Amino acid sequence: MIPWYPAMRKRYRIATTVLFIALCSVSVAQSKAEEQLQKERSNLTRTSDPVSRTKIEIKISDLLITLMSEAARAGEDKRAEQYLNDYSNTISDAHLTMMKTGKDAHKHPDGFKDLEISLRKQQSRLTDAGKLMDVDSRDAVEKVRKQASSISDQLVKTMLLKDPNATKD
């Protein structure tokens, strides 16, 4: 049996304390993001203006990617997949909200532009988060990344062309 020297005990206690603090800080950070997510979802239910709704959904989508990355980092793939599904639904809803406004995105790009910029930024975050997940889940992340890219492309087309159904010569 190995004798416990006072120096070894001290190192063991320090290592245990550091590990405990690290685990606590991860859960506190995640709970803050979840708290913020609930707050934004609450704001969304009270808002009727399409541009304001879209801006709130952009915040929600950013939080969902953050939570998905944290869950993937912690090895909680099922939870990460749920956040990914919520993200997919959120960006689809934001896109649909803006398209239903009937506004000319060429003349009034508010909301359209915000959503397009955020989707472009979020695509790289999705790729990074996908690398943290297991192989099976990476396909789902790639599918959602392509969805974000497609919506972003549609928004650019809508903003640049006066008639989004027309083709540029």
Which stretches of residues belong to each language-model region?
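General helical secondary-structure elements
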Residues: Y5-R9, V28, D49
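Long, charged/polar, soluble alpha-helical segments
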Residues: Q30-D169
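Bacterial N-terminal signal peptides that target proteins for export
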Residues: P3-V18
